[in-house]
């Protein structure tokens, strides 16, 4: 995917954005993709329309504005720079981002290590701001396509769901009937680090933006600002699109394991 996102609104300054209009337009696009996907799955629609709507979303100026807002204002890591050292902390920098945005080559992530409660450390890959914005756009394009496929009992990293919902689901399941029920307490070791690139790319084959996602997966990472390493597997824990890719991998892995 190349080129700039067309700005037909005439807006040049971040302060002039009407967020009510932006949010409405983004919401409508997301619902259109979801409905088109649902119709394609039941045979009353076409996947061609789904792909067309995904492309429309990826080029939408309103979606770009929403992505910039999420990355530079709402996300916890908004003040943390990637390998290029850039963050957008003020109106002028955000205005520059929205006016000069284009799909550029993926940069390596900046890898840092965060202490865990057990004394060990977990790796965190921090993409550059522009890559985070691109990932936020792709997440919005892909999420409604795959959300319809995810299991009802899946709660991790999904919009509108939380650990409290999972607890309530378990409680309701256990209290039904008088038969014994099994509870499996398991952990996927280093889930983000072990995602197969080939597996993910196969599952999103034919969808617009696949090549961009491939570049993010293969971009590598840098430690201590100087040592570069290739990435043959995994998606950085810190990448905006990583939780969605993880859920896609888990969906088909569990279906295979439990023959769902």
Residue ranges and their predicted role:
Residues 1-7:
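Short, charge-rich, low-complexity alpha-helical interaction segments
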Residues 12-77, 140-156:
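Charged boundary/loop elements
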Residues 47-121:
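Phosphate/adenylate-binding "loop-and-lid" substructures adjacent to NTP/NAD/dNTP-binding pockets
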Residues 75-87, 107-133, 149-162, 184-185, ...:
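Short, conserved non-catalytic motifs in the polymerase core
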